[in-house]
Amino acid sequence: MVKLNSTTAILSDLDGVILNLDYDIKFWESWLPEHVANQSNQNLEEIKIKIQAEIDTQRGTLNFYDLNYWDDLLNVDCMEIIREQEEKCSYLEGSHEALQRLSTLKNPKHILTNGDPRAQEYKAETQNFLEFFDSIFYSMHAGYPKEQKEFWTLARHNLNLDFENAIFIDDDFKVVTAATKVGIKQVIWITPGKNRVLQNGVETFPSLADLTAAII
């Protein structure tokens, strides 16, 4: 059972917890390969296979999240591609209301994200999620992704965190596992299905809205 006192730090991922991950999926699976194919006059399916192969190679590293890496690799401007789209990012169902409820608490609140800072700042122009948090801590600035213990050392120092009195929320199981290994006492995995507690102590909730309803 999630326990929250007045000083418990609330640490949350962004994409897949607060914002709908479909937006990012469309970038990687549609917008980016279509742009590269049009620009290079290459077969779209071949480009998709090439990009997916590199994604699989870089997954869990900073390169995977760093749009500068993909700019250089594919000779594109990822942010220009994103800005050209009519579609904008959106909140997951119930997450905006959940943030409004959490905002009534005086607890310290921070976003911890692997996402590229430029992309996340652009998303904040559309959905002002930053108003609900004290800060946003980027793995790009830390120099390590959330999958690595070094990220957590820097996050603890920079945000003055007590891992014994913190809740971390994420939708990526590898990140969730990394958080438990560095000693965060309460780790929440946002994943479909019934609420349950895993063997490593991680507690699951289907959504941020479900978690918020359980603690407020």
What annotation goes with each model-predicted range?
Residues 4-97, 118:
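N-terminal helical cap/lid subdomain that shapes the substrate entry/recognition surface
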Residues 37, 71, 85, 110, ...:
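Short, flexible active-site loop motifs that bind/organize anionic cofactors or intermediates
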Residues 76-90, 95-127, 136-139:
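Substrate-recognition element of Asp-dependent hydrolases with the DxDx(T/V) motif
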Residues 1-10, 100, 116-117, 121-216:
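Asp-based, Mg2+/Mn2+-dependent phosphohydrolase catalytic module
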